[in-house]
């Protein structure tokens, strides 16, 4: 019995020590460093409106359906973060063609002035996560005509808004230029007032 206790005692102490270190100390240290060094990212990269209310995250897209606003990428999960992922169909899958055709039909209904051949691919295809918050500057620009007609905001102002909200490639070489749809729509909302 004494031998059993002598074997169990260090096992229990080591387990408890690592439980405290890995379950409490390490997470607190990492959280403290993250809050000190990159508070915005540690808090979820939240975006606030003029009333200082949280309206979303710059990392997760939202579904904008009002034709007066810029629309983001198609999302097969309807931008529900808990359901992240997409039906990434193979090019040979007929369901992919159906999904793209539906996206194109939706586009035609709201953007009659822009031919389908001018529509950037990111407006009619899903992303891998289904949560992309960004679109290409071209994808934003092709929506200017519709938004200008519905809001009476001059196209030049909308073009400048897109230019102001365009973020370059990370470190100048990773990724492509992009526009965060939520941030763009918040700025658009200011112009509507």
UniProtKB/Swiss-Prot annotation:
It holds the Pfam family KdpC. One of its GO terms (molecular function) is ATP binding. It comes from the Bacteria. It is found in: Cell membrane. The chain crosses the membrane at residues 14-34. It is a single-pass membrane protein. Keywords: ATP-binding, Cell membrane, Ion transport, Membrane, Nucleotide-binding, Potassium, Potassium transport, Transmembrane, Transmembrane helix, Transport. Belongs to the KdpC family. The system is composed of three essential subunits: KdpA, KdpB and KdpC. This is Potassium-transporting ATPase KdpC subunit.
């Amino acid at each position: 019995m004494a031998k059993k206790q002598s074997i169990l005692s260090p096992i229990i102490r080591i387990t408890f020590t690592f439980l405290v270190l890995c379950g409490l100390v390490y997470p607190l240290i990492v959280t403290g460093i993250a809050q000190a060094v990159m508070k915005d990212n540690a808090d979820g990269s939240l975006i606030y409106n003029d009333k200082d209310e949280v309206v979303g995250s710059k990392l997760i897209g939202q579904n904008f359906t009002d034709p007066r606003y810029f629309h983001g990428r198609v999302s097969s999960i309807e931008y529900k973060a808990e359901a992240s992922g997409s039906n990434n169909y193979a090019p040979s899958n007929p369901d992919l063609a159906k999904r793209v055709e539906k996206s194109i039909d939706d586009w035609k209904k709201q953007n009659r002035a822009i031919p389908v051949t001018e529509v950037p691919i990111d407006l009619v295809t899903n992303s891998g996560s289904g949560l992309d918050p960004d679109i290409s500057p071209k994808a934003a620009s092709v929506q200017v005509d519709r938004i200008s007609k519905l809001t009476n905001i001059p196209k030049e102002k909308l073009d400048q808004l897109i230019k102001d909200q365009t973020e370059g490639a990370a470190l100048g070489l990773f990724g492509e230029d992009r526009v965060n749809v939520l941030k763009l729509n918040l700025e658009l909302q200011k112009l509507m007032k």
